[in-house]
Amino acid sequence: MADNTQRQRESISLTPMAHGLENMGAEFLESMEEGRLPHSHSSLPEGEGGLNKAERKAFSRWRSLQPTVQARSFCREHRQLFGWICKGLLSTACLGFLMVACLLDLQRALALLIITCVVLVFLAYDLLKRLLGSKLRRCVKFQGHSCLSLWLKRGLALAAGVGLILWLSLDTAQRPEQLVSFAGICVFLVLLFAGSKHHRAVSWRAVSWGLGLQFVLGLFVIRTEPGFIAFQWLGDQIQVFLSYTEAGSSFVFGEALVKDVFAFQVLPIIIFFSCVMSVLYYLGLMQWVILKIAWLMQVTMGTSATETLSVAGNIFVSQTEAPLLIRPYLADMTLSEVHVVMTGGYATIAGSLLGAYISFGIDAASLIAASVMAAPCALALSKLVYPEVEESKFRSENGVKLTYGDAQNLLEAASAGAAISVKVVANIAANLIAFLAVLAFVNAALSWLGDMVDIQGLSFQLICSYVLRPVAFLMGVAWEDCPVVAELLGIKFFLNEFVAYQELSQYKQRRLAGAEEWLGDKKQWISVRAEILTTYALCGFANFSSIGIMLGGLTSLVPQRRSDFSQIVLRALITGAFVSLLNACVAGILYVPRGVEVDCVSLLNQTVSSSSFEVYLCCRQVFQSTSSEFSQVALDNCCRFYNHTVCT
């Protein structure tokens, strides 16, 4: 009896759960749309006669909810129309806001205007592609004889080569140092071809198009005024955007720690940037940009879809995150394609670290340009070093898709991005502690050994300054700056690019502060040209400590290909290092000094409160001048900051 009572209670208690308040609304809505009462398969009666009390109550509730059902049906039928109306109203409001902002202050609204124009261009492109994509492809496709098509391609290649030679001849007439950078490109390419895995299988189309895209991007960014201004503006906006990190880090750590301690000043930027990148990835903006860049490289260079997507993704994400974009296809990729994936990871830096390097004071425009230029160059050099000799399964982009992550909403994406970056920050901090400690130990050991044979000041940096000096010179760096640049290259290759950029920022800060160029026999700073070329040369993960990171990341995704990854990882590392060096050579060919000449007479004839690079250059002219061009006031100003025999 007790058991029967218990079963009866259980059955009674389950009834409200099945037909309780949670499901009552949905049940009523479904029944009303079907034109029947809840819990009944019969149609609604004409009147309420003949209904019991429960049925009359349900019928009255049905009648009270009938307008809601009609409204719901109307909205469902005209959902597309309502969407268009909402989008139209929102677009009108945004356009009106933009017009008012531009009329009030165009300079202040410039960023919003540029963002709006970029969005409109992308929307117009998508609309044009959807409406006229197939027709445009048929129009631009060459319909002539295959022999004529071949001769047309050869003619265009010959014209491009002759044009490049003529341009170099005219452009380098005033700046012969640019020819050194061109010679560096030739030497590096010859060395890479000599170490190629399959010399006869090299796809010269991929190599030439990759280097051509790299050169065109560099030409636009470095030499043209619109490109230079655009990338400078973009770099300034990123710096302003990253400055908001201080609000969060100051609240957590305090203003004193954020201003004075490196870890609390730089590393929180990585967390903030990673959070933003995760949000952009959730919204699909990152995938859209990656697909467009990959499409451009694939149609010009003839590479496969998977390897091109990975290299394009490396512009924004790190060497371990980019393979996740093509994770389902890694098991079936050829060795040449895997080599491209590795080379792309070594040749670029992560977007989160880009923010950290900018916070050091490294030129933001050069960092952004180096990351973009490295993508086609990595594809080109990888196909030169490890050409394709197998049949790829991914020649077409059909069937290759990018995922949108696991986040269910915007807040989850932001939180996940911040949480993932904690591991990155901890890894960077640990590596800095370890590498700087190892560097100090190595320098102490080398100094101890050097003292035994009367070699004073022997260190790792000194050895690198001699061994890698020819490499720095082939980049186009002036000979007097080559020892410092060679030191930084050695730190980057054998230790870590983070440490190298930190050292470069100290050289730049001393130059901007107006420090003397030489302190004894040690150079205090390097020229602006050397700084720019070094920024390009250091932009990449190609160092020996990254071998374990790359192998660990890829092996965790495809464990059965561990032997394949181990076979080509060192070759990919060397190729990635050469990508950064070729980037620096291209920058060396294209770089021209910018800025207005300083009027030293007017600058020094007034009271100068602090030294700067301009003050140093003007004071050097004062100390070397034998004419009466500079007054005694100018000499006094210079003698307050610098010791010279003239001042005694």
Swiss-Prot record:
<dbReference type="GO" id="GO:0031526">
    <property type="term" value="C:brush border membrane"/>
</dbReference>
<comment type="similarity">
    <text>Belongs to the concentrative nucleoside transporter (CNT) (TC 2.A.41) family.</text>
</comment>
<dbReference type="GO" id="GO:0005886">
    <property type="term" value="C:plasma membrane"/>
</dbReference>
<feature type="transmembrane region" description="Helical">
    <location>
        <begin position="458"/>
        <end position="479"/>
    </location>
</feature>
<feature type="transmembrane region" description="Helical">
    <location>
        <begin position="81"/>
        <end position="104"/>
    </location>
</feature>
<comment type="function">
    <text>Sodium and pyrimidine nucleoside symporter of the plasma membrane that imports uridine, thymidine and cytidine into cells by coupling their transport to the transmembrane sodium electrochemical gradient. Also transports adenosine, an atypical substrate transported with high apparent affinity, but low maximum velocity. Therefore, exhibits the transport characteristics of the nucleoside transport system cit or N2 subtype (N2/cit). Involved in renal nucleoside (re)absorption.</text>
</comment>
<keyword id="KW-0812">Transmembrane</keyword>
<dbReference type="GO" id="GO:0015213">
    <property type="term" value="F:uridine transmembrane transporter activity"/>
</dbReference>
<feature type="glycosylation site" description="N-linked (GlcNAc...) asparagine">
    <location>
        <position position="605"/>
    </location>
</feature>
<dbReference type="GO" id="GO:0005350">
    <property type="term" value="F:pyrimidine nucleobase transmembrane transporter activity"/>
</dbReference>
<dbReference type="InterPro" id="IPR011642">
    <property type="entry name" value="Gate_dom"/>
</dbReference>
<protein>
    <recommendedName>
        <fullName>Sodium/nucleoside cotransporter 1</fullName>
    </recommendedName>
</protein>
<dbReference type="Pfam" id="PF01773">
    <property type="entry name" value="Nucleos_tra2_N"/>
</dbReference>
<dbReference type="GO" id="GO:0015855">
    <property type="term" value="P:pyrimidine nucleobase transport"/>
</dbReference>
<keyword id="KW-1003">Cell membrane</keyword>
<keyword id="KW-0813">Transport</keyword>
<dbReference type="InterPro" id="IPR008276">
    <property type="entry name" value="C_nuclsd_transpt"/>
</dbReference>
<feature type="transmembrane region" description="Helical">
    <location>
        <begin position="148"/>
        <end position="167"/>
    </location>
</feature>
<feature type="transmembrane region" description="Helical">
    <location>
        <begin position="179"/>
        <end position="195"/>
    </location>
</feature>
<feature type="transmembrane region" description="Helical">
    <location>
        <begin position="424"/>
        <end position="446"/>
    </location>
</feature>
<feature type="topological domain" description="Cytoplasmic">
    <location>
        <begin position="196"/>
        <end position="201"/>
    </location>
</feature>
<keyword id="KW-1133">Transmembrane helix</keyword>
<feature type="topological domain" description="Extracellular">
    <location>
        <begin position="168"/>
        <end position="178"/>
    </location>
</feature>
<keyword id="KW-0769">Symport</keyword>
<dbReference type="InterPro" id="IPR011657">
    <property type="entry name" value="CNT_C_dom"/>
</dbReference>
<dbReference type="Pfam" id="PF07670">
    <property type="entry name" value="Gate"/>
</dbReference>
<feature type="topological domain" description="Extracellular">
    <location>
        <begin position="105"/>
        <end position="109"/>
    </location>
</feature>
<feature type="glycosylation site" description="N-linked (GlcNAc...) asparagine">
    <location>
        <position position="643"/>
    </location>
</feature>
<dbReference type="GO" id="GO:0015861">
    <property type="term" value="P:cytidine transport"/>
</dbReference>
<feature type="topological domain" description="Extracellular">
    <location>
        <begin position="387"/>
        <end position="423"/>
    </location>
</feature>
<dbReference type="GO" id="GO:0045117">
    <property type="term" value="P:azole transmembrane transport"/>
</dbReference>
<feature type="transmembrane region" description="Helical">
    <location>
        <begin position="295"/>
        <end position="318"/>
    </location>
</feature>
<dbReference type="GO" id="GO:0015389">
    <property type="term" value="F:pyrimidine- and adenosine-specific:sodium symporter activity"/>
</dbReference>
<feature type="transmembrane region" description="Helical">
    <location>
        <begin position="535"/>
        <end position="558"/>
    </location>
</feature>
<feature type="topological domain" description="Cytoplasmic">
    <location>
        <begin position="129"/>
        <end position="147"/>
    </location>
</feature>
<feature type="transmembrane region" description="Helical">
    <location>
        <begin position="262"/>
        <end position="283"/>
    </location>
</feature>
<dbReference type="InterPro" id="IPR002668">
    <property type="entry name" value="CNT_N_dom"/>
</dbReference>
<feature type="topological domain" description="Cytoplasmic">
    <location>
        <begin position="361"/>
        <end position="366"/>
    </location>
</feature>
<feature type="topological domain" description="Extracellular">
    <location>
        <begin position="223"/>
        <end position="261"/>
    </location>
</feature>
<feature type="topological domain" description="Cytoplasmic">
    <location>
        <begin position="559"/>
        <end position="569"/>
    </location>
</feature>
<feature type="transmembrane region" description="Helical">
    <location>
        <begin position="367"/>
        <end position="386"/>
    </location>
</feature>
<keyword id="KW-0472">Membrane</keyword>
